[in-house]
Amino acid sequence: MSQSDRQKITNKIKEVLFADERIVFAYVFGSFLNSPSYRDIDAGIYLDKIARKDVFDGELEISKKISEACELPIDLIDIKILNFAPGHFLNNVFKNGAVLFSKNEKLLSKIIEETSLNAIANEYFAYQSLKELVPK
């Protein structure tokens, strides 16, 4: 798929997600961004309010909207709600993804900062644990 076609799809995804008042910010990430071939289109969204029990249904609902708007099979759309995502996943999205939009820059900056600080702290502990496990 050409870069131009990818940009058209990305713009359509942005349009669909931005129209949803619940979505505070959105990212696209994964192989769709830079790889010549890709398996699916990954997008991460942060909602102003969602219960943990509603995450799967929310991801499916938004995937369907994007699938219809982009005229792509739903199995090509992989939406992840980021509200309860583990830190290492968030760190990867923020580091390697591309922001589509943010309706609240202050909140986005706060989450990125917290995720980065946690990653740094966890890196130290992981390194210390590894040193204890690996014989000299």
Q: Which stretches of residues belong to each language-model region?
A:
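Catalytic core of pol beta-like nucleotidyltransferases
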Residues: 1-25, 33-38, 52-136
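Short hydrophobic/aromatic beta-strand micro-patches
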Residues: 44-48
